[in-house]
Regions:
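Long, structured stretches of catalytic cores involved in phosphate-ester chemistry, encompassing
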Residues: 1-318
Length: 318
């Protein structure tokens, strides 16, 4: 029979599926856990690709960044399918035609007028190599498709055309996804939980300029959703679940063959100080406790940020 549409447009998703399949087959205790314990999840870089940055940075050319939607789709297939998401529109995968210098993407098989772009993320053009999702730093130096990059969708021009930014660099065809929004919320008793997506919309950080007012961890839409949801919450306690740490930087490498060499490493909110400090000030002014649950860093700790705001981090000790 015919391969699924996503395999035709993003064949490297099969490798991600195989990873999940292998973990569940070999990790008997892990498989038992998933069988018996209902869970909600947040994705971090290792669900996508190690040290993935700049997925929301318009014009950014990076193999890891544009693997986002392939990995996220597999994550939803195996883990996040039950997550309480704010938007349940899956990523859209298409095959586009590009002309050098043109800001128009054409796809005769698409009907962009039927897509709710407010429920979707930005557009990436795939790297286009069979090793695009392999965890190996040496591959970062290898070239991908000349049009592979992070793009802004400027406007829908018709059923088969989008205006994008930046313009294409070369004539050609390549597959692309328009990403999904993975964040959501749920309530238990008198507590509201907000599950953040800290990888899909983040701009490039700068360790040497962590206070850059334009830098964003969450993107404008998710940031506004978070503040609005908390401001209008009737709960007595707020739990904000972030895959990356809030107060402690994550700058150390785990070693091996996959060190991120294209940008100085820091996965945490410590390089997005404008957003972080705005949230702390906002939370501290509430008449309810706010607890930020974080991971990523291979350590565990508790930090009293203010009398009203705490971070509790839980990570593997290795």
């Amino acid at each position: 029979g015919q391969a699924p549409d996503i395999v035709q447009k993003a064949p490297t998703v099969v490798g991600v599926w195989e990873n999940y399949k292998t973990y569940l087959e070999r990790g008997r205790n892990l498989s038992e856990w998933h069988r018996h314990v209902p869970s909600f999840y947040t994705a971090d870089d290792h669900e996508l690709l190690n040290d993935i940055y700049g997925t929301g940075e318009v014009g950014y050319v990076n193999r890891r960044a544009v693997f986002r939607d392939i990995a996220t789709s597999a994550w939803f297939d195996y883990l996040a399918w039950a997550n309480p998401v704010e938007h349940d529109t899956p990523a859209w995968f298409g095959a586009g035609t590009f002309k050098a210098g043109s800001d128009v993407l054409a796809d005769s098989s698409a009907d962009f007028t039927k897509l709710d772009l407010n429920a979707l993320a930005n557009l990436h053009v795939h790297w286009g190599t069979s090793t695009a999702g392999v965890k190996d730093a040496k591959l970062d130096a290898e070239s991908g498709d000349p049009n592979s990059a992070v793009y802004e969708i400027v406007e829908v021009l018709g059923p088969h055309r989008l205006r994008i930014n930046p313009p294409a660099k070369a004539n050609g065809s390549q597959t692309y996804p328009i990403g999904r929004r993975c964040y959501g919320r749920f309530s238990v008793s008198n507590c509201d939980f907000f599950l953040l997506d800290t990888r899909s919309h983040r701009s490039l950080h700068n360790v040497d300029n962590p206070g850059n007012p334009k830098a964003t961890m969450l993107g404008k839409q998710q940031f506004a959703w978070l503040k609005d949801g908390i401001e209008n919450s009737k709960a007595d306690f707020i739990f904000v679940v972030s895959s990356v740490n809030f107060m402690v930087p994550h700058v150390g490498s785990g070693g091996g063959d996959d060190k991120q060499l294209t940008i100085k490493k820091d996965d945490a909110w410590t390089v997005f100080l404008r957003e972080r400090e705005e949230l702390i000030e906002f939370w501290d002014g509430l008449d309810k406790g706010v607890f930020v649950l974080t991971g990523d860093l291979h350590n565990s700790f508790a930090i009293r940020i203010t009398d009203n705001v705490w971070e509790f981090a839980s990570g593997p000790h290795n």
